[in-house]
Structure formats: structure tokens, C-alpha cells
């Protein structure tokens, strides 16, 4: 169920923001697909390319939530700074509104502590992005190199049975096969043969058992890369999910701090929030704060 939920989240992300982000990420990995293939590559859950995008897209999504939390944090700070600059907080302890001012000071201290904890999360996000990009870049370089080697081997194999099949046709067919057959999460023999069948179906050729075995052997290096990708996905998925929960928690906590501060300020007999300045301070807050919740 967790895998389905995570995939639904990415599907919603892709449907909302289209293919541009995905194309840019694949471009960083020196992977370029024709427009008609990229839509399939990023929208079909079984696709190798969809798996490759999983962590980078999650990092982008987490980054948006973290930025929203940061915007709330900054706004809460501005509310308190304007209040402190007004001189309201320095009134005599026995003057009207003393209890409210004490509560506002408690909120200020909590906000400082929360901000320190949030900064640690921002650093954790930066480290996660750097480490995951380095690992996925290495896998992508290996994939691109081994893909070309494999295509040359397959080209030689198919030439022996059908000289009309061109290397470019094999490339397109193999990419389509890796889009439709999930060899990242399931490297069973059944799945491997399904991939070979998809490859030959796209090429519109019929091959015997011996040639199938030869094709399978020549694909072994690509299978190893997919296995390495799966290992890294397991590692980074745990980290991105943990970070996601923390980011959403901070966003909620900062939002709740804002509500409490505003309600406390309303109780003060003399100090009021400046509507004009508040409108300026609120400008960065017009976003969908349910992002990452669905």
C-alpha cells in the first residue's frame, strides 16, 4: 500500500506540473528521449525512467514544502519583530495586557527553538539532494555506457537473422521494453522474458529459444544496473519519506504559531497589526499548503 500511495503522489505531481521538470532531471543524467517516448517513460509506473525520477522528483516536492514552511517561519518572525519594535513588549509588567505580552514572549522563544530545528532539516535536505544526485548520476552514466554496448551486441545478433533491422530501431524497441516491463523491482525470469518478448514484438520479429537466451545474456549488464538502482531507491526512499514527514510537520507548526500570535495580538488593548505592512508580509504566503498531503 505504501508503494501505491507514493506512486499516486508522484502521478499527481506529474499531472500537475507536466513533463518539463522530468525532462530537465533526465537531461542532467544525459538521458534524452523523443517527445512521444518521454510521456510514456515518466507516466508508466513500471518504467525504468520513472524509477530513476522517483527520488529527484520527491526531492523537488520536499523542497517546495520546506520553502512553504520557511515562508511561514519568516512571516511569524515579522509579526513578532513589528510587535517588538512598537515598544509594546517593554511596557510595565503590571500594565494592561501583561499576561498577553508574557504569552507572546513564550511564543517568540518557541519560534526561535523551532527555527533552529528547522534549519537542521534544511541542511539534511541539502545533504540528501547531493548524495542522491551523486549516486543516481553514477547509475545513469553506467546505464548510458552499457546501453550503447548492449545495443551494438544486439545489433550483431539481429543482423544474423534479419538484416533489415537497424540499430536505431533496436534502440527504440529496447527503450519501450524497459518502459513497459519493470525490471527494477522484479528481476524474475518471467519478467526478463516478458521484456524480450516486448522487444521482439516492437521490432515485429519472431525469434527462437536459442536467440532469446542470447539476447538475455547480452542484457545482463543492464539488469545489474537496474538492481543497483533498486538498492539505492530503497535507501533514498526511506530518507525522503522521513524528510517529507518532517517538512510537513514544520509547515504545520509554523502555521499554528502564526495563528496563535495573531490571536494574542488581537487581545492587546493598544497595539494593532498594520494592515498595509501585513499585506506586504503576506505576499509570499499565497500558495497551496496542502502540497505533499495528498
UniProtKB/Swiss-Prot annotation:
GO cellular component terms, semicolon-separated: cytoplasm
Superkingdom: Bacteria
Pfam families the record matches: DotZ
GO terms under biological process: protein transport
Subcellular location(s) of the protein: Cytoplasm
Subunit and partners: The T4BSS is a complex nanomachine composed of several subcomplexes. This subunit is part of the Type IV Coupling Complex (T4CC), a subcomplex composed of the DotLMNYZ core and the IcmSW-LvgA adapter subunits, linked by the C-terminal tail of DotL. Six DotLMNYZ hetero-pentameric units may assemble into a hexameric nanomachine, forming an inner membrane channel for effectors to pass through. Makes significant contact with DotN and DotY, but engages weakly with DotM and DotL. DotY and DotZ are co-dependent for the assembly into the T4CC.
Name of the protein this chain belongs to: Type 4 apparatus protein DotZ
Taxonomic lineage: Bacteria, Pseudomonadati, Pseudomonadota, Gammaproteobacteria, Legionellales
Gene: dotZ
